[in-house]
């Protein structure tokens, strides 16, 4: 992912749910361009953070071997804006997974307050070119470790999720 709109995962249960956070800071350059003189996190970037949380939950289900991309946002509602000092908590729930894609519901909260909610469809893309990854395996593995997925991630039985060997390659 060239642009990562989450700071770290706080929970992941394989094939079920995930939670991640994004701290909104005055240091974020994109806040100053969206509405001049009113620093606010653009809703499109909040939606992208929600999608990244959901997409990585879906990708983990198959040991990060599927090429998962956002296909369609079927519903999204924003209830409030996010401003510097807010911590967004993204919560994703895997609703369905099929060979060609998946569906997830996701929310964004500021504290206990619902900030946004969405239903998102994802696609597993072109199996014919699966030999060409979206990301270099080692770089993607480093990103996932930086997001703390393997620190907090658990299988449904409670055992710890391990970084797959194919993401440790040089």
Task: Locate predicted features.
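A residue-level signal for conserved active-site and pocket-lining positions in enzyme catalytic cores
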Residues: 9, 50, 112
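Hydrophobic beta-strand-centered segment that forms part of the acyl-chain substrate-binding groove
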Residues: 54-89, 123-125
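Catalytic strand-loop segment that frames the active site of acyl-thioester-processing enzymes
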Residues: 1-41, 161-170
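Compact, glycine-rich, soluble single-domain proteins
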Residues: 35-42, 47-55, 70
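Conserved positions in beta-strands of structured domains
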Residues: 7-10, 74, 79, 93-95
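Hydrophobic core residues within well-ordered beta-strands of beta-rich domains
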Residues: 3-5, 88, 102
């Amino acid at each position: 992912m060239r642009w990562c709109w989450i700071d770290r995962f706080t929970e992941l249960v394989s094939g079920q749910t995930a939670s991640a956070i994004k701290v909104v800071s005055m240091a974020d350059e994109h806040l100053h361009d969206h509405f001049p003189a009113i620093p606010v996190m653009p809703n499109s970037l909040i939606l992208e953070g929600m999608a990244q949380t959901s997409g990585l939950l879906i990708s983990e289900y198959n040991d990060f071997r599927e090429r998962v991309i956002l296909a369609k946002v079927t519903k999204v509602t924003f209830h409030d804006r996010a401003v510097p000092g807010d911590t967004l908590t993204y919560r994703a729930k895997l609703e369905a997974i099929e060979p060609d894609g998946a569906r997830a519901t996701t929310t964004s909260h500021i504290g206990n307050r619902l900030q946004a909610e969405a239903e998102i469809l994802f696609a597993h893309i072109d199996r014919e070119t699966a030999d060409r990854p979206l990301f270099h395996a080692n770089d993607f593995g480093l990103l996932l470790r930086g997001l703390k997925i393997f620190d907090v991630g658990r299988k449904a039985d409670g055992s710890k999720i391990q970084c797959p060997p194919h993401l440790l390659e040089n």
